[in-house]
Amino acid sequence: GDSGNKAVNPDGPTLAIEETPDSQSTTNEKGELTAEEVAKKVKPSIVGVIVSETAQNNMMGQNQSESGEGTGIIMGEDKTGKYTYIITCAHVISGNNVKATVQLEDGTSYDADVVGYDERSDVGVLRIKASGLQAATFGDSSKLAVGQQVFAIGNPLGTEFFGTLTGGFVSA
């Protein structure tokens, strides 16, 4: 059956995601970044993902188009510096005949290639032909504890609310 996976090039580039602490950040009394510091540090790495999907002929013999928006996070560049990779949700980019565009906070847009996605984990990867963009700093989620404060930054309801910050706590 269908595994829920799609890979454009399974032998393509590999990106290592490592914890990269920033020694210049302000922390709270527990040594954790404050909400303001999280926003300042992560917001430049947040992108909008705009997709359109052209469905094949409907009952009337016409092509139909659907569109949607989501959030992505800049992972980093490939070794050549030619491409930048973006993590997003699989449900945003999955489908046939999907055209994706990545939009930066300043409005700059790039056509994006769907590298692959896994519907079961809802993780997708895009790539754009760009360099010099600020990649997000990734931590180790296995070090989180129940009750610890966490934050999410994204574009709820599309790019109109670009870089919205919300907070919560780790549950079980």
What do these predicted regions represent?
Residues 3-172:
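Serine-dependent protease modules
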